[in-house]
Regions:
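Beta-strand/loop edge motif enriched in small/polar residues
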Residues: 1-162
Length: 162
C-alpha cells in the first residue's frame, strides 16, 4: 500500500505495479488552487496508469484536482482505473453500499451562476466562485473560462463515493 501525499506539488505518475494499492488518507490535492483567472503557470498533472487502484478509508477522503491543474487518468476497457472504498477492497460492500468516501472532484474555472463566495459578483464572471459542499476544508471552483481543461478521464470506475 502506498499512501498518497496530502498535496502533489509537482507532476507525478501513479504506476501500475501488480499487488500495489494507492491510498487516500484524507483530502489529496493535485496542485494548489491557482485562482479563478487563467495563469501562465505550468500545471501540476497527476497521471494515473491503466489498472491502478486507489482506495479511501473514510468519508472525508477525496481527490481534489485544483483549478489550473490536471488529471490524466486514461485506463483501457480491459484495465480500467478504479477509485473505490476500503470496504470494496476488503470485499465488504453490498448492493446498498454508498457514500464510503468523498470521490474525485475536478475544481475548474468554468463559469458558475450561483456566486456563494462573493454573492454580489456577476454570475459567470471571474469573481463568481463557489465552495465544495460537505468538506471540512472546502475547495473553490468557478471563474470565467468556459473551455477550461482539468484533464482527461477515460475508462475510470468511481465506486461507493458520496
Amino acid at each position: 500500500i502506498c499512501e498518497l501525499p496530502a498535496r502533489f506539488t509537482a507532476s507525478a505518475t501513479l504506476t501500475k505495479i501488480p499487488g500495489l494499492l494507492y491510498s487516500l488518507g484524507g483530502r489529496v490535492d493535485v496542485g494548489l488552487d491557482r485562482g479563478a483567472a487563467p495563469t501562465a503557470d505550468a500545471p501540476v498533472v497527476l497521471t494515473i496508469q491503466p489498472g491502478v487502484v486507489i482506495y479511501a478509508s473514510t468519508g472525508v477522503s477525496w481527490l481534489a484536482v485544483n483549478r489550473g491543474n490536471r488529471i490524466s487518468a486514461i485506463g483501457t476497457p480491459t484495465s480500467p482505473i478504479v477509485f473505490t472504498s476500503r470496504d470494496n477492497v476488503l470485499g465488504l460492500v453490498t448492493d446498498d453500499s454508498q457514500g464510503q468516501w468523498g470521490g474525485v472532484v475536478l475544481l475548474a474555472r468554468a463559469p458558475v451562476t450561483d456566486c456563494t463566495v462573493a454573492p454580489a459578483a456577476t454570475p459567470g464572471s471571474v469573481n463568481c466562485e463557489r465552495q465544495t459542499e460537505g468538506a471540512v476544508d472546502p475547495a473553490y471552483f468557478g471563474g470565467a473560462t468556459p473551455n477550461d481543461n482539468s484533464g482527461t478521464m477515460k475508462y475510470v470506475q468511481i465506486r461507493y463515493s458520496g
